[in-house]
Regions:
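Conserved beta-strand/short-helix segments
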Residues: 1-218
Length: 218
């Protein structure tokens, strides 16, 4: 089967937990996608819990995946999810409760068709902060892209600060994203930026200043 297993992958800090994205799997409809989690146990990789399937046909869940340090929290990007329009995208977070993977809070959806939210995702070490890339978003021009950062308050995911928009149209900002361990510094890849020639690309780094995201360096 053309499942495309390994399109994304993440490890816990100790390397004993593994998450594998399988975006073309058909468990909940054609190309709904899924993520499987494995634990290293007695010399073999054993699946922990059931497959976490995409919500619907064509979601491509597992295009991106991130794990908390202890491997007990997993974030799953489904950039082709269509709740807010075709390819608006979606991000879901699950936590291991000892017997199964249970969703934490509501799904986070892209704003509109083409946003492709969930193309990239990153988690802080404790799994309480997530950064989500939506490179097709048009907030600062067509396909300028953006990243949104959310924090878990015990009941739901609350956005921290404003959307971090790409600099200009076609930046595709949010194609890749990374978070520091404490979730207070985020690095954002924008491969379509033309600052040093067509599609030369760039990376911007932001730090949470208590009220807003402040760029570090140029």
């Amino acid at each position: 089967e053309a499942d495309a297993a390994g399109t994304s992958v993440a490890l816990s800090s100790d390397g004993q937990m593994l998450a594998i994205g399988v975006p073309d799997a058909d468990g909940n409809g054609e190309n709904s996608g899924l993520v499987r989690l494995y634990e290293w146990d007695a010399g073999t990789w054993s699946q922990l819990g059931g497959d976490i399937n995409g919500e619907a046909f064509g979601d491509a869940a597992g295009t991106s995946v991130a794990l908390s340090s202890d491997g007990q929290t997993v974030a799953i990007g489904a950039p082709q999810h269509a709740d807010s329009g075709r390819d608006s995208g979606q991000l879901r977070v699950y936590q291991w409760n000892g017997s199964s993977w249970v969703q934490m809070g509501a799904s986070i959806d892209g704003y509109e068709g083409g946003d492709a939210l969930g193309t990239s995702v990153a988690l802080s070490s404790d799994g309480q902060t997530i950064a989500i890339g939506a490179p097709g978003n048009d907030g600062n021009g067509l396909s300028s892209g953006h990243v949104r950062v959310y924090q878990w308050n015990g009941n739901s995911w609350l956005q921290i600060g404003e959307d971090i928009n790409g600099k200009v149209k076609a930046d595709l900002s949010g194609t890749s994203v990374s978070l520091s361990s404490n979730g207070e510094i985020v690095a954002i890849g924008a491969p379509g930026n033309d600052g040093n020639g067509s599609d030369s690309g760039h990376v911007t780094i932001y730090q949470w200043g208590g009220h807003s995201w402040l760029q570090l360096g140029g």
